C-alpha cells in the first residue's frame, strides 16, 4: 500500500463517499451512512443487529463483492477496532466485534478469489 493510499484511507470520512453512486447487492449504498452510525454508537442491540445485517448483505452476496464494499470495509474496520476496545465493558460492542470478525473472515476468501494473479 502506498503512503498516499494509507493517508486517504486514514482520513476518509463517511460524508466524503458518494454512497448514492456505489452499487450494492440490492441497489445503492445510500443507507450506508445511517447503518454505520448505528454500529458506531454500539448502544441498541436490536438496531445494531439490523444495521449490521443490512450492511453485510449489501456488501457481499453469493461471493460477489460490490462497489460499496471497499468503502464499507474501511469504516467497518474502524468500528471493529472501537468494538474490540469497548468489548470488556459493553455487551453490544462484544457482540459486534464477534460478528465483524466473522464477516471479515467471510470477505477475505472472496476477495482473493477475484484477484488476477500474474502468470509466467
Positions of predicted regions on the chain:
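N-terminal "cap/leader" segments of large eukaryotic alpha-helical scaffolds
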Residues: 1-46
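HEAT/HEAT-like alpha-solenoid repeats
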Residues: 36-41, 74-81, 85
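HEAT-repeat alpha-solenoid elements in large eukaryotic scaffold proteins
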Residues: 48-56
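Positions within ordered alpha-helical repeat solenoids
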Residues: 57-61, 78, 82, 102-110
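Short sequence/structural elements of tandem HEAT/ARM alpha-solenoid repeats
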Residues: 67-74
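Short secondary-structure subsegments characteristic of cysteine-rich extracellular domains
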Residues: 86-108
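Conserved small/polar residues in nucleotide/adenosyl-binding loops
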Residues: 113-119
Amino acid at each position: 500500500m502506498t503512503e498516499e493510499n494509507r493517508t486517504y484511507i486514514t482520513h476518509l470520512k463517511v460524508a466524503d463517499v458518494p454512497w448514492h453512486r456505489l452499487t450494492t447487492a440490492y441497489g445503492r449504498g445510500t443507507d450506508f451512512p445511517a447503518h454505520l452510525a448505528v454500529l458506531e454508537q454500539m448502544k441498541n442491540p436490536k438496531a445494531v443487529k439490523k444495521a449490521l445485517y443490512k450492511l453485510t448483505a449489501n456488501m457481499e452476496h453469493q461471493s460477489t463483492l460490490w462497489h460499496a464494499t471497499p468503502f464499507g470495509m474501511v469504516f467497518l474496520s474502524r468500528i471493529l477496532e472501537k468494538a474490540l476496545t469497548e468489548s470488556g465493558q459493553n455487551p453490544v460492542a462484544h457482540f459486534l466485534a464477534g460478528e465483524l470478525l466473522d464477516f471479515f473472515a467471510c470477505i477475505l476468501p472472496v476477495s482473493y478469489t477475484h484477484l488476477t494473479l500474474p502468470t509466467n
